[in-house]
């Protein structure tokens, strides 16, 4: 969430930051409401100070021997009670106005860092580096063809069970999924991440805190009879692990890794990636999440990105790192690196991980602070996919495909899978 004080004190700067995302916003009404709220708070504080003085004066008079029923004391108490009524009215007005302001601010995305390249969309993203040697040429099959030939998955049965954009994995497909999850968790925990297995149902406050709501309500599955939603990413429950908390400074940084099923309606992707494992309503993902002190978040961003890259390197999958331009940033991010894995069958790079620094945006929405000495401040949060399991499987199938119809598995995965190749089932 954007800082209300910064909006009030320098709305033009915030408007320019949002304009870099392609949003034309007039913050004048919000600024006026914020100034009014500040005025109400000051007026209430003034009345409370007067009330405290009256209470003190009443106590002194009674202590000096004046009767509590005297006209003088009764008059003072009457004034005090009147002030309390005024204060109660002001408090209700403040609450209503503060709620209205928060509701408006929740709709605004994070401001891009000054270092973030300007641009409108993915076409303006900046390639930072690449790794590995992409397989290029004719004759490479797409992952869904390979998976069907090997008997790894069945989409028709999934439609019967649920609907389109779901997949059921069988035999080597199910084992490969499980192997990848365990492999990724082991690599990340060996680097100091604490493993978490969070709920897949989360409440509205958790989704608001991470920045998923209200923006992405139509993209999420909701349980209509409860205040619960199927989580679109483990980033949501991981953020809320410390919602409304003060984290002791000496405990920072906190690094979590979590495997979680993820659920998305994909409302805006009609006709895209209708086959295979790239775009599903339900998919598995391993998520990395950091809570850090503000001055170290940019350094942490490089580390969390490298940790996600390490998985691709160990799996021998060619990829590139792309810095997102201001117009392509996710809602909560101030800076993002996408890792895009090479798929020779599709003859293209596809996103497999998004590594974002959200600075204090999520922490302000979730009220997550740290305290060092007498100073309390918001933490910074970072997240990265480490990695999306289905897309990783797709990349392994396409990059490991052999002329005899088998798929060669990366050496690092063999101890987890138990065999060095996938064969027809």
From Swiss-Prot:
Gene3D superfamilies: Bira Bifunctional Protein, Domain 2 (3.30.930.10), Serine-tRNA synthetase, tRNA binding domain (1.10.287.40). The gene is serS. GO terms for molecular function: ATP binding; serine-tRNA ligase activity. It catalyses: tRNA(Ser) + L-serine + ATP = L-seryl-tRNA(Ser) + AMP + diphosphate + H(+); tRNA(Sec) + L-serine + ATP = L-seryl-tRNA(Sec) + AMP + diphosphate + H(+). Its EC number is 6.1.1.11. Pathway: Aminoacyl-tRNA biosynthesis; selenocysteinyl-tRNA(Sec) biosynthesis; L-seryl-tRNA(Sec) from L-serine and tRNA(Sec): step 1/1. Homodimer. The tRNA molecule binds across the dimer. L-serine binds at residues 233-235, 287, 385. It comes from Prochlorococcus marinus (strain SARG / CCMP1375 / SS120). Consists of two distinct domains, a catalytic core and a N-terminal extension that is involved in tRNA binding. It is found in: Cytoplasm. This is Serine--tRNA ligase.
């Amino acid at each position: 969430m954007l800082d209300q004080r910064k909006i009030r004190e320098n709305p033009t700067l915030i408007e320019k930051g949002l304009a870099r995302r392609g949003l034309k916003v007039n913050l004048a009404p919000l600024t006026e409401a914020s100034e009014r709220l500040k005025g109400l708070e000051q007026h209430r504080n003034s009345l409370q100070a007067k009330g405290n003085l009256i209470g003190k004066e009443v106590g002194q008079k009674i202590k000096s021997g004046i009767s509590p029923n005297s006209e003088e004391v009764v008059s003072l108490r009457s004034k005090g009670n009147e002030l309390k009524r005024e204060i109660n009215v002001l408090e209700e007005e403040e609450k209503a106005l503060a709620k209205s302001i928060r509701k408006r601010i929740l709709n605004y995305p994070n401001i891009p860092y000054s270092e973030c390249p300007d641009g409108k969309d993915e076409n303006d993203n900046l390639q930072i580096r690449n790794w590995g040697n992409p397989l290029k040429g004719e004759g490479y099959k797409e992952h869904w063809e390979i998976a069907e030939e090997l008997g790894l998955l069945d989409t028709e049965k999934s439609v019967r069970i649920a609907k389109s954009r779901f997949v059921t994995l069988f035999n080597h497909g199910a084992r490969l999924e499980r192997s990848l999850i365990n492999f990724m968790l082991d690599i990340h925990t060996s680097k100091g991440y604490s493993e978490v297995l969070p709920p897949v149902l989360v409440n509205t406050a958790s989704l608001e805190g991470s920045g998923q709501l209200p923006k992405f309500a139509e993209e999420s599955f909701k349980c209509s009879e409860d205040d619960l939603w199927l989580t679109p990413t483990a980033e949501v429950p991981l953020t809320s692990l410390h919602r409304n908390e003060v984290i002791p400074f000496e405990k920072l940084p906190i690094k979590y890794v979590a495997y979680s099923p993820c659920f998305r309606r994909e409302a805006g992707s009609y006709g895209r990636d209708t086959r295979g494992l790239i775009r599903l309503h339900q998919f598995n993902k391993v998520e990395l999440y950091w809570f850090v002190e503000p001055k170290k978040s940019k350094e942490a961003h490089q580390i969390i990105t490298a940790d996600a890259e390490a998985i691709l390197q160990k799996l021998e999958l060619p990829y590139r790192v792309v810095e997102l331009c201001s117009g392509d940033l996710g809602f909560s991010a101030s800076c993002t690196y996408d890792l895009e894995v090479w798929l020779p069958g599709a003859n293209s790079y596809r996103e497999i991980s998004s590594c974002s620094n959200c600075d204090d945006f999520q922490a302000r929405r979730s009220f997550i602070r740290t305290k060092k000495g007498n100073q309390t401040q918001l933490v910074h949060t970072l997240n990265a996919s480490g990695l999306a399991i289905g897309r990783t499987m797709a990349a392994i199938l396409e990059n490991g495909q052999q002329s005899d119809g088998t798929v060669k598995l990366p050496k690092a995965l063999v101890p987890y899978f138990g065999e060095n190749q996938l064969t027809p089932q």
